[in-house]
Swiss-Prot record:
The gene is hisS. It comes from Bordetella avium (strain 197N). Signal peptide: none annotated. The keyword Nucleotide-binding applies. This is Histidine--tRNA ligase. Keywords: Aminoacyl-tRNA synthetase, ATP-binding, Cytoplasm, Ligase, Nucleotide-binding, Protein biosynthesis.
Length: 428
């Protein structure tokens, strides 16, 4: 006797997106692509798998992502260490270097797709999640930093989102961070007895991240620590002032957060996050900043760059809360039929209506009119096209309007098949 196969479930933290929610995703992505194209950004697509050394070099060996969160394995064919991308920026920069994109001119590019981190799943934090990654490669001034932030403000408005606030900081340049790092280590050494395990681990490897602690017991100590902003030179301050002035000009509100450092080592100068209190502990909807050294660090010709990433699942959650999401209909027209001749005619009518640009579902199989109408209503279609023996004989169709916005809910007309498409289009 064959043993019953135990059904397979999705991996914890890696979620299926079923037809209803998937329609929301498609609508959301249409809005996002139109928004990005409105600012001149063009799509790039990079592989999910990259060489591990791209991320250890680009993100930083002592970051949480590299130390604890990457899905890494050895390729059995050549022994190469490969990693499923935990973020997109490093891969986009690798592609720009490999294909000599920056030798001719700067580029505005974006990617949308899945990324992977080995984390403990919870609301807003998954092992496979999706990002909108936006990069301005080859741009140096504070104007582009501000434009990216203003762009995001426009997206929130388009989606009807409120309660998202902007936090800003400057990480300065490497020499300024080195001076601050020395002062910070000296300060933290005086408080080593109260540091938690994460703090002690990061004390000499990544002391800035100690200040980003979520441990309430360390907040007072972190608040009194030396501030990086006090170590910034004239050029770094001028760049940050330029960003703030342009945000003021655009009417974008913000707060300065001296402890905002981001979780990736490649940032310098401007860093920012858009955060909300409406998603529980996972309140960061979008984060980004400037990374002028990353292109050179990964083997390219030195070039400035700035970008951001949006967490799609978190933003969709926020959008749903704001009632911005309405389930799109499965089709505009649902064709119901009774009898073999009507079923065959329905297939031809469906194709004719699609030729006219309408989305159409032709009921599959045999069923009563009652059950077909029930299915038509559930589909969200605005009209039902009804075909029976009489319609076949007279080359007509009965049209029943199912929605209040479709020429009168419940009304029914008789329409010649030759003019059916134009009638439905005119009443759309």
């Amino acid at each position: 006797m064959t043993q019953a196969f135990q059904k397979v479930s999705a991996i914890r933290g890696m979620n299926d997106v079923l037809p209803g929610p998937s329609a929301q995703w498609e609508r959301f992505e249409e809005i996002v692509r139109a928004w990005l194209q409105g600012y001149g950004y063009r799509n790039v697509r990079t592989p999910i798998l990259e060489q591990t050394r791209l991320f250890t070099r680009g993100i930083g060996e002592v970051t949480d992502i590299v130390e604890k969160e990457m899905y890494t394995f050895t390729d059995a064919l050549n022994g190469e260490s490969l990693t499923m991308r935990p973020e997109m920026t490093a891969g986009v920069v690798r592609a720009a270097i490999e294909h000599n994109m920056l030798y001719e001119r700067p580029h505005r590019v974006y990617s949308i797709g899945p990324v992977f981190r080995h984390e403990r799943p919870q609301r807003g934090r998954y092992r496979q999640f999706h990002q909108i990654d936006v990069e301005a490669l080859g741009f140096a001034g504070p104007d582009i930093d501000a434009e990216l932030i203003v762009m995001l403000g426009r997206l929130w408005n388009t989606l009807g989102l409120a309660d998202i606030r902007l936090e800003l900081n400057s990480l300065g340049q490497p020499a300024e961070r080195a001076a601050h790092r020395a002062a910070l280590i000296e300060y933290l050494e005086k408080h080593v007895d109260i540091l938690d395990e994460d703090g002690k681990r990061r004390l000499y490897t990544n002391p800035l991240r100690v200040l980003d602690t979520k441990n309430p017991a360390l907040q007072e100590m972190a608040n009194a620590a030396p501030r990086l902003f006090d170590f910034l030179g004239e050029a770094s301050r001028a760049h940050f002032d330029g960003v703030c002035q342009r945000l003021d000009d655009a009417g974008i509100g913000y707060s300065l957060n001296p402890r905002l450092v981001r979780g990736l080592d490649y940032y310098n100068l401007t860093v920012f996050e858009w955060v909300t209190d409406r998603l529980g502990s996972q309140g960061t909807v979008c984060g980004g900043g400037r990374y002028d050294g990353l292109i050179e660090l990964l083997g390219g010709k030195p070039a400035p760059a700035v970008g951001f990433a949006i967490g799609v699942e978190r933003l969709l959650d926020l959008w749903e809360q704001s009632a911005g999401q309405q389930t799109p209909p499965e089709c505009e027209v649902y064709v119901v039929h009774q009898g073999e001749g009507a079923q065959r005619l329905a297939a031809r009518v469906g194709e004719d209506l699609r030729d006219a640009g309408l989305s159409v579902i032709v009921h599959a199989g045999a069923a009563s009119f009652k059950s077909q109408f029930k299915r038509a209503d559930a589909s969200g279609a605005r009209v039902a096209v009804i075909l029976g023996d009489d319609e076949v004989a007279t080359k007509t169709a009965s049209v029943k309007y199912l929605r209040a916005d479709a020429a009168g809910e419940g009304a029914q007309d008789k329409v010649a098949l030759a003019t059916l498409a134009s009638v439905l289009k005119s009443k759309g």
